[in-house]
């Protein structure tokens, strides 16, 4: 564990400066203090295979407020808990490469395994409370609703198990299309007893949480067999509008109770959404967009050239967007990229925000605790 301060390297990422030290990931350099400070960092994967050309860590860290541990799954098949001092408190070998991060509720950590096993662990000790085995790779952050844990596989099955003991409750499956699909899966979004889930065949389906019964289904990608995916986790705003994106046909706003289309912005390649207030942020192939939720009007668009923008989060007035190369700091009002920070070989996992603290897992499996300032008032680099 350590921390090194210093000036960063400048490089182009949109129009923002890039800060970091890609050649020496064990010594992350500080960006200007107007943005954040690296409170601590720790390496999690001890040995990197010599033939691993482009390591990738897609599983977001998750914070347990009861134990104050950060729970992380990494590509070496381990789950680790990192304490508030940046030191590993416990570890558990699952042997499976993780595709998504976990969920914490009342001291229990629910973790999806790439080997198809859903784990419930004690956040303080790592003890296994129960596990439920499927035959499919689990690919989304679990959701807790009405006493059930819901999770989606990478082959279009939603599993629901009881949170108390992991007993099977129900499952819903759709057959994937015969053509090419996009990597990723839609986690269920639950609202008022209904789970909204997208599938790789281009359908958005509303399911009853209690038994998995279909409330309605809606095709959003039209005809064809390739890249029909609705892999975005749906979002719902305070007005009750349901937002979801088809990789082929763009961003939709729907009536949550019926699936009726309110509007559609025909922008292909979108893979993640975030709704806050009256604005919907959408990210995907080479772009970050902001839309007005009521009408679908484009507020701004930030091009990223050949980079894919992954799932964004909001923290201290900034939109934080991993783009595989770095973590972008984007002004959510104007769409201007203020800064990019690369701690090593890029970032694929969404950061986890706890107040002004942001936990970031880099692609070379270093976990960083960043303390953010009021970054909207930072320099206009």
Residue ranges and their predicted role:
Residues 1-3, 212:
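N-terminal export leaders
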Residues 74, 113-114, 153-154, 199-200, ...:
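Structural signature of WD-repeat beta-propellers
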Residues 17-63, 89-105, 128-146, 168-192, ...:
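Extracytoplasmic beta-rich repeat domains
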Residues 10-12:
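C-terminal motif of bacterial Sec signal peptides marking the signal peptidase cleavage site
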Residues 318, 322-365, 372-380:
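C-terminal closing repeat unit and adjoining cap/tail of repeat-based domains
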Residues 83-87, 122-125, 162-166, 208-212, ...:
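Short loop/turn segments that connect beta-strands within beta-propeller blades
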Residues 69-71, 109-111, 149-151, 159, ...:
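Conserved beta-propeller blade signature
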């Amino acid at each position: 564990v350590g921390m090194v301060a210093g000036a960063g390297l400048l490089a182009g990422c949109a129009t923002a400066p890039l800060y970091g030290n890609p050649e020496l990931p064990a010594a992350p350099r500080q960006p200007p203090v107007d943005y954040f400070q690296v409170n601590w960092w720790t390496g999690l994967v001890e040995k990197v295979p010599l033939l691993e050309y482009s390591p990738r860590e897609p599983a977001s860290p998750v914070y347990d407020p009861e134990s104050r541990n950060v729970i992380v799954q990494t590509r070496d098949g381990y789950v680790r808990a990192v304490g508030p001092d940046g030191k590993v408190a416990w570890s558990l070998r699952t042997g499976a490469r993780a595709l998504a991060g976990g969920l914490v509720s009342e001291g229990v950590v629910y973790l999806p395994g790439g080997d198809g096993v859903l784990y419930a662990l004690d956040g303080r000790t790592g003890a296994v409370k129960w596990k439920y085995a499927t035959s499919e790779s689990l690919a989304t952050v679990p959701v807790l609703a009405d006493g059930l844990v819901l999770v989606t596989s990478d082959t279009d099955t939603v599993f629901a198990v009881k949170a108390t003991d992991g007993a099977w409750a129900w499952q819903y499956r759709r057959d994937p299309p015969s053509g090419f699909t996009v990597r990723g899966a839609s986690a269920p979004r639950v609202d008022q007893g209904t789970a909204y889930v997208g599938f790789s065949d281009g359908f958005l389906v509303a399911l009853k949480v209690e038994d998995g019964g279909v409330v309605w289904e809606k095709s959003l990608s039209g005809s064809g067999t390739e890249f029909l995916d609705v892999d975005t986790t749906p979002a719902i705003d305070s007005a009750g509008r349901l937002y979801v994106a088809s990789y082929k046909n763009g961003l939709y706003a729907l009536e949550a109770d019926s699936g009726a289309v309110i509007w559609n912005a025909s922008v292909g390649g979108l893979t993640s959404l975030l709704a806050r207030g009256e604005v919907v942020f959408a990210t995907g192939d080479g772009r970050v967009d902001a839309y007005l939720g009521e009408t679908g009007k484009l507020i701004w668009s930030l091009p990223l050239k050949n980079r894919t923008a992954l799932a964004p989060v909001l923290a201290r007035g900034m939109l934080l967007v991993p783009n595989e190369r770095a973590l972008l700091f984007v002004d959510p009002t104007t769409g201007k990229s203020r800064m990019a920070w690369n701690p090593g070989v890029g970032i694929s996992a969404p950061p986890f925000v706890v107040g002004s603290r942001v936990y970031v897992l880099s692609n070379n499996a270093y976990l960083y605790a960043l303390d953010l300032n009021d970054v909207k008032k930072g320099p206009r680099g």
